[in-house]
């Protein structure tokens, strides 16, 4: 008992130790002597309280037989809990001054039955051990299961852990107030390498309609080797303006990727790139070009430059217009030969009557302009006709003109260049 007094045990623990068997008494005495060496002189320190709880837990484990019989008696359970509170308060009052009352530690008062006191102390110790044991075990499980279930939130894990602990503590929590256990939260789950599912929910969140791969994948008609047109769904043709922003066929803003995607082939792609804006001539420019063409079918380079400067056009525009006009003249001659009808090659003007037009002969080098007649009545030649007759009488030669060879294949390629300003039709008589 002297060693128990030095270890400052509670009265309930001392009484339980006195009722234990001889081997239990010897083991408890050895442990008490070992813990007495570690206690400090201050009875109110934290080490004093911790060693007191360890001694009571060891004594309760050694007297398991007596505690088991007392725990099975359900009739004394409420009384033992109330007596445990009273004994704890009395033990704290006696432990406050152990040096002033040494006799009280050696002879504690018997205020409750020994079986009930030991049962209450055992139940309290078991609840503390169970709470700490289950908390540690559950924390270990949560640490092991964290890498496997990263998609669960920490809030759900902590809620599940709290429910599991409350279910496992069972009857101990019903008889005694729950012991607040502060378990550390598991570490936050590492971020996924592949990114969250919300950000990857859409395949192409920002894919523009002008992307090459998007057009080829959507349309599915890619055939760059074919030179012919392919049958395409009309829906894609109607929606083609969404991609290029302009009508598709023959448009200046044609998209080459869309042309390939629709299966139009390399020829259509070349035509799409080659197509340019058509030149619009004004009425004075067209009048000057027509007058010069009626008097001269071919122009040399100096003459072409002079005419372009006088009309405010470029040399290329004048050359192209003359090429197209010659092709039109050939078509008119061919139509006249087939229908055996005279053709008026002059451009009809508001101040001119149709009968005043002249017709040219088949000889383009030395042919002379003869004034036409309507109904057999001759008409007086105008100043323009006189100028044309003077030009033709000079006998201009077309052997040294630079655009003579360029006119050889114009009949097949004449549809590439058009004249928008020449909207007036040539009359056929």
Swiss-Prot record:
Residues 177-192 have a biased composition (Pro residues). Signal peptide: none annotated. Embryonic brain; accumulates in approximately 30 cells in each brain hemisphere. One of these cells is closely associated with the terminus of the larval visual nerve (Bolwig's nerve). PROSITE patterns: HOMEOBOX_1, HOMEOBOX_2. This is Brain-specific homeobox protein. It is found in: Nucleus. Belongs to the distal-less homeobox family. Residues 17-27, 105-132 have a biased composition (Low complexity). Residues 274-333 bind DNA. Its main location: nucleus. DNA binding protein that function as transcriptional activator. May play a role in the determination and function of cell types in the brain. Residues 69-84, 158-170, 376-388 have a biased composition (Polar residues). One of its GO terms (molecular function) is DNA-binding transcription factor activity, RNA polymerase II-specific. It holds the Pfam family Homeodomain.
């Amino acid at each position: 008992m002297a060693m128990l007094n030095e270890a400052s045990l509670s009265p309930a623990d001392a009484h339980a130790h006195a009722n234990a068997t001889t081997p239990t008494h010897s083991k408890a005495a050895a442990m008490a002597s070992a813990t007495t060496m570690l206690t400090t002189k201050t009875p109110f320190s934290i080490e004093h309280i911790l060693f007191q709880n360890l001694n009571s837990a060891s004594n309760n484990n050694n007297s398991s037989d007596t505690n088991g019989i007392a725990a099975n008696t359900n009739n004394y359970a409420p009384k033992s809990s109330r007596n445990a509170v009273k004994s704890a308060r009395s033990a704290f009052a006696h432990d406050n001054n152990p040096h002033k009352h040494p006799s009280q530690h050696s002879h504690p008062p018997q205020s409750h039955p020994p079986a009930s006191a030991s049962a209450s102390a055992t139940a309290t110790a078991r609840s503390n051990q169970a709470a700490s044991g289950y908390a540690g075990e559950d924390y270990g499980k949560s640490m092991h299961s964290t890498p496997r279930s990263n998609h669960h939130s920490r809030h759900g894990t902590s809620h599940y852990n709290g429910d599991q602990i409350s279910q496992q503590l069972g009857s101990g929590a019903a008889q005694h107030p729950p012991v607040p256990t502060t378990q550390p939260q598991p570490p936050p789950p590492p971020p996924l390498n592949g990114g969250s599912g919300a950000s990857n929910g859409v395949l192409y969140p920002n894919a523009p309609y002008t992307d090459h791969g998007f057009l080829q994948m959507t349309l599915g008609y890619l055939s760059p080797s074919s030179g012919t047109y392919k049958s395409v769904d009309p829906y894609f043709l109607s929606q083609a303006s969404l991609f290029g922003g302009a009508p598709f066929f023959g448009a200046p803003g044609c998209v080459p990727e869309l042309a390939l995607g629709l299966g139009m082939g390399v020829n259509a792609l070349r035509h799409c790139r080659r197509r340019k804006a058509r030149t619009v001539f004004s009425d004075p420019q067209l009048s000057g070009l027509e007058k010069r063409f009626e008097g001269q079918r071919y122009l040399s380079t100096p003459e072409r430059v002079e005419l372009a400067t006088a009309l405010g056009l470029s040399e290329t525009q004048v050359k192209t217009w003359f090429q197209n006009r010659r092709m039109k003249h050939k078509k008119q001659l061919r139509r006249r030969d087939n229908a055996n009808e005279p053709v008026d090659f002059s451009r009809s003007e508001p101040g001119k009557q149709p009968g005043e037009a002249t017709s040219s002969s088949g000889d383009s080098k030395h042919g002379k302009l003869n004034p036409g007649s309507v109904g057999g009545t001759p008409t007086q030649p105008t100043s323009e006709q006189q100028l044309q007759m003077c030009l033709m009488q000079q006998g201009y030669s077309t052997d040294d003109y630079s655009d003579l060879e360029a006119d050889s294949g114009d009949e097949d390629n004449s549809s590439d260049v058009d004249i928008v300003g020449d909207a007036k039709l040539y009359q056929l008589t």
